[in-house]
């Protein structure tokens, strides 16, 4: 389950160089875009290098928001794509403000200046709204974000009206600016007008709903065709039922066989509360595709799993799909009181049938918070963690200090 607020994803390997190398293609893509922009503007119109960088950065912001599989692969995770997306958006604002002040106010033709001012006002407003996002309903927040596209169009008008023939005759500068502008426009158009219509090819309906405890439901979905995913991944789910917002929300897959999928959802926000209280069997749903790089199957033979509360779902998915465990696994599941724990019977039964599955249940009310100061982590193990971000950061430091050779992968979600 992915908690509703801002989206955060972290995959941390204790070998920092390996971690960097896994995202190298994405990092190179961003750096190369900026370097090419700097070199091209310096060679032709160096006085406009700052707004040129702002235009490239804005174009990249739209491109990174498309959730394209290629970008997720380049950055080794959708969450890291979003982190860079936020960076390019913020950088764009800084560059535009600097451009405005350095020029003594936007100048050129009166209309061109007005387009530029409109773009900056909208961008700054969106940034302020983004910081106030937790106080705004998600659907309203999503629609307000679309104003960025309008500001981007105003900004393009401003650039082309100011630059005139330098961008309207074929040369390296016009090719660079035109290419990034076109990619940004296409990306924004896809996000706003096409993604919701063509980006969800898996169509199905809810076939069963099960209350697991006082605030958690398991949703069973049957799809018209198999959904390709691996244990540990998540998907964006749209629910077509009166009273539900039309926007997709991400949830971890907690099991299934391709056409039948399970999602476990905790009541922790407006949308998830609506799911817990009002979702009905028979409602239509759609999915886009599988995301995520916390893929348990790719880990080493010795593994340590660590989970907190509702974030057990990626591990439940693996357990359901692998009744016979072929790895050596130590699983630490932390929860606050058994009434808040999930799938305890399934875990105990799995441990009984698989002697290489070592189960540790940690009730923080009785046992205190889970820590690894006195617990041993096998030297060459892969450690998977999925839980509250504060818990994972604390445990990551403890494990890193104890065993620098461990491969540590953790995933945490918040989504606005």
Per-region residue spans from a language model:
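N-terminal membrane topogenic signal
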Residues: 16-30
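Ferredoxin-reductase
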Residues: 196-286, 335-337, 348, 363-365
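Membrane-helix interface/capping segments
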Residues: 65-78
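Terminal, non-globular segments
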Residues: 49-52, 58
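Short, hydrophobic transmembrane alpha-helix segments
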Residues: 38-48
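FNR/FR-type flavoprotein reductase catalytic core
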Residues: 26-29, 84-192, 259, 268-416
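Juxtamembrane/interface segments at transmembrane-helix termini
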Residues: 71, 136-140, 192-202
């Amino acid at each position: 389950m992915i908690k509703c607020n801002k989206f955060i994803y972290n995959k941390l390997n204790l070998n920092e160089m390996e971690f960097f190398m896994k995202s190298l293609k994405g990092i190179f893509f961003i750096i190369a875009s900026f370097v090419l922009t700097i070199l091209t503007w310096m060679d032709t119109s160096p006085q406009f290098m700052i707004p040129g960088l702002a235009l490239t950065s804005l174009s990249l912001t739209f491109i990174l928001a498309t959730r394209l599989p290629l970008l997720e692969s380049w950055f080794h995770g959708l969450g890291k794509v979003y982190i860079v997306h936020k960076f390019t958006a913020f950088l764009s604002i800084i560059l535009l403000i600097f451009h405005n002040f350095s020029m003594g106010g936007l100048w050129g033709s009166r209309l061109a200046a007005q387009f530029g001012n409109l773009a900056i006002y909208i961008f700054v407003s969106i940034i302020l709204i983004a910081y106030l996002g937790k106080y705004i309903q998600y659907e309203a927040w999503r629609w307000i974000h679309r104003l960025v596209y309008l500001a981007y169009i105003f900004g393009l008008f401003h650039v082309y009206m100011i630059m005139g023939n330098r961008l309207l005759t074929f040369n390296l500068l016009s090719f660079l600016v035109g290419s990034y502008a076109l990619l940004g426009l296409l990306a924004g158009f896809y996000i706003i007008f096409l993604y919701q219509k063509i980006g969800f090819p898996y169509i199905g309906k809810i076939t069963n709903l099960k209350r697991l405890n006082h605030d958690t439901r398991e949703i069973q979905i049957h799809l018209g065709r198999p959904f390709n995913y691996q244990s540990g991944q998540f998907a964006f789910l749209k629910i077509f039922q009166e009273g539900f917002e039309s926007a997709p929300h991400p949830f971890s897959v907690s099991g299934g066989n391709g056409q039948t999928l399970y999602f476990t959802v905790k009541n922790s926000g407006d949308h998830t509360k609506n799911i817990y209280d009002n979702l009905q069997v028979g409602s239509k749903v759609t999915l886009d595709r599988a995301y995520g790089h916390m893929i348990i199957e790719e880990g080493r033979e010795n593994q340590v799993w660590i989970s907190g509360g509702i974030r057990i779902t990626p591990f439940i998915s693996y357990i359901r799909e692998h009744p016979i465990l072929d790895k050596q696994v130590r699983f630490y599941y932390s929860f606050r009181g058994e009434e808040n724990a999930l799938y305890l019977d399934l875990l105990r039964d799995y441990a009984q049938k698989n002697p290489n599955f070592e189960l540790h249940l940690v009730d923080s009310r009785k046992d205190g918070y889970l820590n690894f100061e006195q617990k041993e982590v096998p030297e060459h193990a892969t450690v998977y963690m999925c839980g509250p971000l504060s818990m994972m950061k604390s445990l990551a430091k403890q494990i890193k200090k104890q065993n620098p050779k461990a491969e540590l992968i953790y995933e945490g979600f918040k989504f606005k």
